[in-house]
C-alpha cells in the first residue's frame, strides 16, 4: 500500500527517502534566479523561460527550457496563485501517478515531474515534462472528421489508464474533463483483459490540482486544499469518467452527431440513481453543476466505472 511505502525521491532531487504521510517535513530543492539547487547547495538545473504562459484560478503555468547534466528538456513550471494551495500535494500525486503508469509501460500518459521546489518567497512550485505537438481534447474534437471514433478511443484509453490508477492508488482525478486531456499525434496501443485499443493518437491526463488518493474509500491525500469537502470519499465509483462524459456531451457539436449505439451508451452513462442528467448537460454550457452531484457523499455511477466503460466500448473498437 502506498501509504506505508518509503519512496526513493532521488529523481526529484530529494536527499532522503520519504513517505506520503509526512510530505510537509520534506526538505525541497530551492529555486533562485531561475536555478534549482539541491539541499546540499549543488546546482541541479537551470530554467530558461520562453515567455509563453497560462493557467487558471488555482495555478500558473510557464513554458521553459530545462537544462541539467543530461541535456535540455522542454518543460512547464507550475506555481500557485495562492499560498501553496495544495500544490506540493498535487506535485507528489502527479509524481506517483506517473511512476505507477511507467511501471506498466504507460509513463508518457501523465507528464513526468522533474522536481518540486521552493521559490525565494517560500511558495512551492514544480517542473514537469511538456507534451509537444499536442492539442487540448476539446479543440481536437472541434476539428475532428471522425468524431464518434475519436470519442470511443478517448474514453477507452482514459478508462484503461484510470483502471490501473484506481486499482493501485485508489485515485480520483476529480476534475476530469475534455480540457484536462491532451492529445498527441503519436499512435497508441493498449490492452485490457483481451480488449485491444489501437488508436491513431495518444491520450495524456493533466492537472491533478483536485486529485485525491484513498484507502477503502477514505481520502488520505487531497490536493484540493479544502476546495472540496474534507470527508469526500476517495475514490467514488464512476466519478471521473462521469465527469468526462458530461463534458463531452455538453459540447453541442458532439452530442448532435452521436448515433447508435454510442447515443444509447451515453444515455446510460448520464443516468445517476435512475435520474438522467442529459437534460442539464444540454441546457448549460458550463459543467459546474455536475460537481454538485458528484460531491454528494453517496454518489455512485457503476456504469461509469473504468471496467464497465471498457466492456461497453470493446465491441466498438
Model region roles, listed by residue range:
Residues 3-9, 228-317:
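Helical subdomain adjoining the active site within ATP-dependent kinase catalytic cores
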Residues 14-69:
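ATP-binding glycine-rich phosphate-binding loop
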Residues 41, 48, 61, 66, ...:
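Membrane-embedded alpha-helical bundles of multi-pass transporters/translocases
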Residues 50, 57-104:
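ATP-binding glycine-rich loop module of kinase domains
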Residues 78-80, 140-143, 216-221, 249:
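Short coil/turn segments at secondary-structure boundaries
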Residues 105-149:
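Conserved structural core of kinase catalytic domains
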Residues 144-174, 178-179:
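Conserved kinase catalytic-core helix
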Residues 177-237:
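Catalytic activation segment of kinase domains across protein kinase-like and atypical kinase folds
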